[in-house]
C-alpha cells in the first residue's frame, strides 16, 4: 500500500509538472473564436492521471498545475483565471475518471472521456458568465461591450454574453476536451508501464 501511494504521488507530481508546461503551449483559432480564447492541451495529463490513478488524482493534478502557474508566473486576475481553469479541468477529469473507475475497459474510457468533455463544456458557460468574464471586466478594465465586439467581429448577431458563450465557448471547450480524449487514447497504452509502475 505504501509503495502504491508513493508511486501514485510521484506520477501525479510528474503529470502536474507536464500539465504546467503545456499551459504555456497555447495558440488561438482565428476566425472561429476571439484570439484571447486559446487552445491548449494542459488538461491531458489530468485525464491520464484520472484513468491511471483515479478521479481524485485527476482533480489534484488540475489543482497543482494551476498552483504552479500562480507561483511561477503570477496572476493578473487575483487567481480567478486559474480558479476557473482548475474547475473546468477538475470537472473533465473527475467525470471521466469516475466512469472509468467502475468498469475499466477501452469502451468506458472513451465514454468517460466524452462525458467529461461534455460536462466541462456545459460547466464552461456558467463559470465564464458568472466568474471569468466579470473578472476580465474588473481586472483588465475591459468594458463588456469590447469583449462582445470581439465575438461580433466573427458573428454580428452575437449580441449578448450568454449567446457568445453558448455559440462559441461551449463548442470550443467541447472540441478541446475531445481532442484531449483522442490524444489520451493514443498515448495511454505506451505510457501505461510508467503510469502504473510496471516494467
Where are these regions (language model features)?
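Loop-helix junctions at membrane interfaces
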Residues: 1-199
Amino acid at each position: 500500500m505504501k509503495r502504491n501511494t508513493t508511486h501514485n504521488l510521484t506520477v501525479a507530481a510528474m503529470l502536474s509538472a507536464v500539465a504546467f508546461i503545456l499551459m504555456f503551449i497555447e495558440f488561438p483559432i482565428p476566425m472561429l473564436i476571439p484570439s484571447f480564447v486559446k487552445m491548449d492541451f494542459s488538461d491531458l495529463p489530468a485525464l491520464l492521471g484520472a484513468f491511471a490513478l483515479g478521479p481524485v488524482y485527476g482533480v489534484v493534478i488540475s489543482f497543482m498545475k494551476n498552483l504552479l502557474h500562480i507561483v511561477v508566473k503570477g496572476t493578473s486576475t487575483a487567481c480567478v483565471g486559474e480558479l476557473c481553469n482548475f474547475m473546468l479541468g477538475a470537472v473533465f477529469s473527475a467525470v471521466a475518471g469516475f466512469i472509468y473507475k467502475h468498469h475499466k475497459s477501452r469502451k468506458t474510457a472513451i465514454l468517460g472521456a466524452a462525458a467529461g468533455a461534455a460536462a466541462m463544456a456545459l460547466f464552461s458557460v456558467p463559470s465564464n458568465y458568472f466568474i471569468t468574464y466579470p473578472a476580465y471586466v474588473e481586472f483588465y478594465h475591459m468594458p463588456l461591450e469590447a469583449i462582445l465586439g470581439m465575438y461580433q467581429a466573427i458573428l454580428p448577431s452575437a449580441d449578448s454574453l450568454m449567446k457568445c458563450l453558448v455559440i462559441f465557448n461551449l463548442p470550443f471547450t467541447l472540441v478541446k476536451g475531445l481532442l484531449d480524449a483522442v490524444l489520451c487514447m493514443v498515448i495511454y497504452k505506451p505510457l501505461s508501464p510508467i503510469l502504473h509502475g510496471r516494467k
